[in-house]
C-alpha cells in the first residue's frame, strides 16, 4: 500500500528549508555592504581609462583594438603583462555582441566589482582554515570595507585581477593542505588550480611569477610528516619524493599557462622575455645616470625611445651591470627613505600631504578613507604579533613573509607606489585578522573563565613569542608615528578644508570677493595645494582678472590646473598657448576634460563655433579629439571632431534668440550610406541623414519656446562604429559616429 502524504506539521517539516547559519547571514550582509560601498565610490568617481595616458588607458586602447580586430599590439614604450588587455577585450567584445560598445567600460568595472566582492567569501574561508572562525569573519570584513579595496575596482583597473588571483591561489594552496588529511580527496587537483591561478596573477602583474619560489617553500614545509630523522635517511627520501610530486603538480600547470606567452615574445622579438620588460626598465630608470645626476626621468626615457623595443631589456640590463661595477651603492641609496615611506597612513597622505587629489573623489568619501587608515593601523600593528608567534598555520607563514619582504624590496629598489604594496597589506591584514581573532577568542574565554584567561595571557606575554610581538609592535608603531607629524598635518588639513568649503559656498552664492578671501586663507594654510589654487584661479578667470589667475595657479601642474591655464590663455587672446594647454590636458587627464570644462568654464558668448580647433573647450562634451580636415576653397583651415555616440553643444549667445533663428550644422558621416543623426533642441528632435564622406550643411529651426533665451543647448546622438573593424590598416579603435566641424545660430 502507498504511504499517505504528510499533512499538518509533518508536511511543514518536509518542506523546511536548509538552516541558514549566522555566519552565512553575516557574510551575506557584508557582501551587500561591500557592494554598496563600491557603488558609492563609482558614483563619485570621474576617472575614466578612455581619457587616461597612464597604464589603464593603455590597457583599454589596446584591448579595444584586440576586441575589434583580434590583433594584439604591445605598448610602444614597454612590453607589458597581457592579462588585463585580454580581460578588458573580453568585456569589450561582449559589449559589441550586445550591439552597444559603449557598455564596455561598465562591464569591465562590473567584472572588477564582482572579483572584489568574491574576495570576501574566499578571504573568510582562507582565514578560517588557517586561524579559525573569528579570524575569518574579521578578514572578510576588512575585504569588504577597507578603503583601498573599495576604490580598486573603479579607480585602478590594472590591479583587481591580480589581487583576486593571488588570494584565490593562496586559498587553493590551503585547500590542498587540508585535503591531504581526507581519504580519497585527490589533493593534487588543488595544486593544479594553485598553479593556474598564480600564472594568471603573473600575466596580470609579473612579480607574481617569481613568487613560485615561495610556493615551493610552502610545499616543502607541508610535505614534511613531522617525524624524527632516521639514520638511514629513508624518512628524508620520502619527504623529498612527496615534495617533488607536489612541486610538479603545481609547476606543470603554472608553466603551461605562461609558456605560450613566452613563446609569443620569442617569436616576435627573438629574445627571451618571460612576461614583460617592466622590472628591468623601471630599475634602470631609478638607477640611471640622468636620474642620479638630477636631470630627471625625461632624459632616461628619451634614451630608451631611441632604442628598438626588442633591444631595450638587453640595453638596460647591461647598463645596470655597468652602474653596479662603477658605483655599487647606487642600488641601495634609496632603501631607507623608501622603506619608511611604506609605513604611512595612506589616506592622510593623499588627502592632506599631497598637492592634489588628482581627480580621485577623496573629499566625497573621506569618512570611508579615514576609517581605512584606522583599520590599516590596527591590522598592521596586530599582524606582527601573529607573524612573530609560534607557527601553527603551516607553510603559509613562509608564503606571507616571502610576499611581504619581496614587495617591500621591490619598492625600495624602484619607487613606492601604493598599488605595488597591495600584497603587503593583503598578508598583513590576514595575520592581523588572526591576531584580532585570537584576541576575540581570549575575551570570550575571559567572560567564561577569568582565571584561565589570565593564565593564558600571562603565559603568552612572558614567552619569547609574546616578547617578540611586543617588540615588533612597538618598533612598527614608532616607525609609523615618527614618519609624519600627524596631529599637526591633520589639524592644518581640517582648517584648509573648512576654508575651502567656505569659499565654495561663497562662490555658489555669487559672492566672488568672499570666495577669494576664503580661498586665500586656504592657501595660506597649504600653499602647495594645487587643487585649491585651481579653485582660486577659476574665480579670477570668471572676473576677467587673468594675470591674478596666472599668479594663483603658480608653477605646479595638474591636468585640471592646465585646463584653467588654457582658459586664461584663451581669455587673453593667446590662442596658441591655450590650444597647447587644452589639448595636453584632454589627452592625459584621465577624466573627461570636455565634460569638466563644460561644468567649470564660462566661455565667451558666440553665435558660431568651430569644433576641433583646440579653442572649443567649455562649449561641448561627448566628442573625440580635434582633427584637421581638408581646407575650404579659399584655403582656410577646417577642423572637426568626431561625435562619439552621444554629445552636447552649449552656446552662450551674445543676444537672445529671436523668431526665425535657425541652427546651422556642418557634418559628414563615417560609414557608407547615411548615418541617422538625432538633433534635439529644446523639446524638438530632428533626425538628419548624414552622408558618408560628404561635408554638408544642415539647418534646423529653433523651436518657438526658446525665443528670448540666451543659452542654446543642442543634444546629438548617432550610431557608432569602430574604424579598425572596417579597415584594419587604419589602426583606429575609437568609437565614432559622425564628424561635425561647425555649429552656428543664424
Where are each of the predicted segments found?
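Membrane-proximal lumenal/periplasmic loop motifs of glycosylation machinery
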Residues: 44-57, 67-89, 322
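Multi-pass, polyprenyl lipid-linked donor-dependent membrane glycosyltransferases
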Residues: 54, 83-84, 107-115, 138-173, ...
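Loop-to-helix entry region of an early transmembrane alpha helix in multi-pass inner-membrane enzymes
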Residues: 82, 86, 97-121, 152, ...
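Transmembrane-helix signature of polytopic, membrane-embedded enzymes
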Residues: 102-106, 118-145, 163-164, 182-186, ...
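Membrane-interface anchor segments at the N-terminal boundary of transmembrane helices
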Residues: 107, 331-400
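Transmembrane-helix motifs of polytopic, lipid-linked glycan transferases
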Residues: 107-131, 168, 172, 381-385
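Membrane-interface transmembrane helices that cradle and orient dolichyl/undecaprenyl
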Residues: 130, 169-191, 201, 219-229, ...
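Membrane-proximal stem/loop segments at transmembrane-domain junctions that anchor or position
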Residues: 266-349
